[in-house]
Amino acid sequence: MFLYIFVFTILIGIYLLTARIGGCSDKWFFAIVMCVALFVGLSDMLGGYDRYIYAEFFDQVADVSMTVSPDYLHECGIFRQWPGEKGFGWLNVLISFLTSNRYIFILILTVIIYVLLYISIRQYAKNNILALIVFMGIMFFFTFTYLRQMLGISIAWLGIRYIYDRSFWKFVLIILIAFSMHNSALVLFPIYFIPPKRYTINSVLVILSVCLFLGILGVSSFLYDSYGDAFDTERIDILTGSDGGIRFGYFVEAAFFAYIILQNYEVVPDTKKDNVLLNVSLLFCAILLLFIRSENGGRLSWYYAIGVVATLSNIAVYRSQTGQGFTMRMNTFMSYHAFLILLSFFLYFRILRGWGEGGYQILYPYKTFLTNGHRVPDRTFDEYEYDYKYDRDKLYR
């Protein structure tokens, strides 16, 4: 656990060293993001059973690639498992020409995700390191396990710029590519048709209240059933599965983020870009409330998380430009950025601790695939390992 805390602490240190100049240069920031990517990508099947599922499908694709006349669509289970998401299947095929090893495959996928994240933060955030810290609190740990959806999300985030640039077909192209990786990317499509303007606080509160009301009524299952062509039955059951109760965590997260944003509403400049990011962040809150009775429906809000990452970090920059005199501006800046860092750490630590409970300890102790063997105990390995040759030699393929 302490290694993860150390990683977060290092990012805080970098931020404190670069805060006065607005973050790192693009080159240094890229290097930092790649270090985070390697930390995730080199880990030895950490994050849960999803990695084993993707790894087994990839190994099958790699085996087919070695045949004389590969027939991927009929011989590879990945195309039958996700028939509507062939983009991910063909990406597996492409990577199989580079490696047949599942660990290298996961590393390549992770690097792709973080390269796309780097591009998004560079485009949308005023302070790249602070934005990365906020990302760490909200989404970092999901890059360990939800590889396919995170790939779709990181691609979809590239389309945000085409909303405020009003480039419809470029936006559609990005969404279609993301959709081919994970069909849930379709949830980002409606944002293009929301005018890129500032809405009144009262209007925002009304919309959030309506989403909360609909969420309490359990409307999410109905919405998914209406889009049966876009989401397979299994995904509907997973994402809209309800235990019959309200997920209080969704409400707290949505209410807290909405409160911070609305408290600083006037601080954010009234530009197309800032308004789009602002609206995206508020829609993140709205989706959490809409799926407040859903076991995993909150995962749809991840497509809007870049709005929260950019807006919250940008507010810190904008607050430093307000007030009378340098001292007041710096006090305003320091108080908010300290609060934002503490909030990000709380969210980060909450997931870190939560994913270590229940006997699985899917994140720690940390281990890379650079050494053979597996962690003991490791219930995920015991239940989902499909090829024990990897345990004896990580690079045997």
Language-model features and meaning:
Residues 1-397:
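Terminal, non-globular segments
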